[in-house]
């Protein structure tokens, strides 16, 4: 996305930003495309969503009353009408391309025209703290399965099956990898720098997590300790349970980081421990918003101590 803006303008922008802007950690620009055929119900639906790091900032939906690229972050509302016109034209062109691809894939897989099928695509770039490219990527899937992907060298394609081999042969002839590489190494980085500058109050902030530990008795007689991290941004965080200072990564249950709905994230990690040994276990929380890692233990209240004693007596009587 963004390829229609004058490249000279983007290069000037990158030259201005690069010497003065540095950021903690890496940042990413990613686009997710989904095209779904629906025989008998009209043309395929096409949705494009863009993310800077973990923040959705643009969206296009062909099923909208007036399909247009629209802002999904307040800082994107500063973009002028020319930007939205250009991006809408790009999206409409992509929509037409996916219609053709859906028809081609029917023939590649010898499928009938009566069923619904889905193409998914993810592409983008990551930059380091100095604004230089760390990596670029482009991946395609068909009906939920890997189809074709750009290798790390950004020069060759990895294919999943014979149908994807047909696509690779076409793309090798028309220079698709070279175009993707030029976009990922140049335009993608330039637009990411622009978006980071545009939304720096939101995108470059560091909200530290609030952490605490809860205890949950189990029928087996032991207990689960769950370490919570809430209200943090960006999403990258590390939770590690330790026993007497030794990591317990093999014994932990760890959920994926989840959006909290208010622009921050939440996550938890749990471990099963013997009843009465809770104080030997520590949860270590690492996040860029913290000046140093947090160490959290379960802190029982007086009422909790009484409840655990009753639980122990009940289990002892049962045994």
UniProtKB/Swiss-Prot annotation:
Say yes or no: keyword Disulfide bond present. yes
- Domain Ig-like C1-type stretches: 209-295
Q: Where is this region: Alpha-1?
A: 25-114
Q: Which residues lie on this side of the membrane: Extracellular?
A: 25-307
Q: Does the keyword Heme apply?
A: no
Where exactly are the transmembrane stretches of this chain?
Answer: 308-319
Membrane disposition = Single-pass type I membrane protein
Indicate where this protein resides in the cell: Membrane
Give the residue ranges for region: Alpha-3: 207-298
List the PROSITE patterns: IG_LIKE, IG_MHC
| Glycosylated residues, chain numbering | 110, 280
- SS bonds (residue pairs): 125-188, 227-283
Q: Which CDD domains match?
A: IgC1_MHC_Ia_RT1-Aa (cd21015)
Q: What UniProt keywords are attached to this protein's entry? A: Disulfide bond, Glycoprotein, Immunity, Membrane, MHC I, Signal, Transmembrane, Transmembrane helix
Q: Which PANTHER family match?
A: HLA CLASS I HISTOCOMPATIBILITY ANTIGEN, C ALPHA CHAIN (PTHR16675:SF251), MHC CLASS I-RELATED (PTHR16675)
| UniProt function note | Involved in the presentation of foreign antigens to the immune system.
The protein's name is Class I histocompatibility antigen, Non-RT1.A alpha-1 chain
- Whose protein is this, by species? Rattus norvegicus (Rat)
């Amino acid at each position: 996305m963004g390829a229609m803006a004058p490249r000279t303008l983007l290069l000037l922008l990158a030259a201005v930003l690069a010497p003065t802007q540095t950021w903690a950690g890496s940042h990413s620009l990613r686009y997710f495309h989904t095209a779904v055929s629906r025989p008998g119900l009209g043309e395929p639906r096409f949705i494009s969503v863009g993310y800077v790091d973990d923040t959705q900032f643009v969206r296009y939906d062909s099923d909208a009353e007036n399909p247009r690229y629209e802002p999904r972050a307040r800082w994107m509302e500063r973009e002028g009408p020319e930007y939205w016109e250009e991006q809408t034209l790009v999206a409409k062109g992509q929509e037409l391309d996916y219609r053709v691809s859906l028809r081609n894939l029917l023939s590649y897989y010898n499928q009938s025209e009566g069923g619904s099928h889905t193409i998914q695509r993810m592409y983008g770039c990551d930059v380091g703290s100095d604004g230089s490219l760390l990596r670029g990527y482009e991946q395609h899937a068909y009906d939920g399965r890997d189809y074709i992907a750009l290798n790390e060298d950004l020069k060759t394609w990895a294919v999943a099956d014979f149908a994807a081999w047909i696509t690779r042969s076409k793309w090798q002839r028309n220079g698709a990898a070279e175009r993707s590489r030029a976009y990922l190494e140049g335009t993608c980085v330039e637009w990411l720098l622009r978006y980071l500058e545009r939304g720096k109050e939101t995108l470059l902030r560091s909200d530290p997590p609030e952490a605490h530990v809860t205890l949950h008795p189990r029928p087996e007689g032991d207990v689960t300790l769950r370490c919570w991290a809430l209200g943090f941004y960006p999403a990258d965080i590390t939770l590690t349970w330790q026993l007497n200072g030794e990591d317990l990564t093999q014994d932990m249950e760890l959920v994926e980081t989840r959006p909290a709905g208010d622009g921050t994230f939440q996550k938890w990690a749990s471990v099963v421990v013997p009843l009465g040994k809770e104080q030997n276990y520590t949860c270590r929380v690492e996040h860029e918003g913290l000046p140093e890692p947090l160490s959290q233990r379960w802190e029982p209240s007086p009422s909790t101590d009484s409840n655990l004693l009753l639980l122990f007596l009940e289990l002892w009587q049962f045994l």
